[in-house]
Amino acid sequence: VDIITMGCSKNLVDSELLMKQFEANGYHCVHDSKKPNGEIVVINTCGFIESAKEESINTILEFAQAKEEGRLKQLYVMGCLSQRYQKELEQEIPQVDKFYGKFNYKNLLKDLGKGVIASCNGTRSITTPRHYAYLKISEGCDRSCAYCAIPLITGKHVSRPKEELL
């Protein structure tokens, strides 16, 4: 499984959590290979700023073309872009096997005939250099700024309990 991460460090943490679940289910994972050849590719998209949307769409199109050419078997898209524009993406890029919203890894695993490994919940396969890793302490936003799409994409602000963080 190749997991491609677009956008912010929160997406990277989501991808690392997904990688751990795939590995616990017996899959070999590669992160950000950017080479469209393999069995399964999952693209974790960004839909916040215009340049990130374009990069996400271009990446999806590149891998959709690779799927058409037979260089990969299954293509899945998740993350902010597919959360916000799922219907439009489904219509425009039918090569994608399925679009999932913002980090809906449980349904992705289920659709692949696998389950969530409870002992791995909250643990992840770190992809950053050994001297640091990102810590995702919250998700969403409670503000409704006219220029910002984060509340629309990620929902209301939710903090992780401090017991999980410490």
PLM regions: where:
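Proteins enriched for Cys/Gly/acidic motifs involved in redox and nucleic-acid/cofactor modification
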Residues: V1-L166
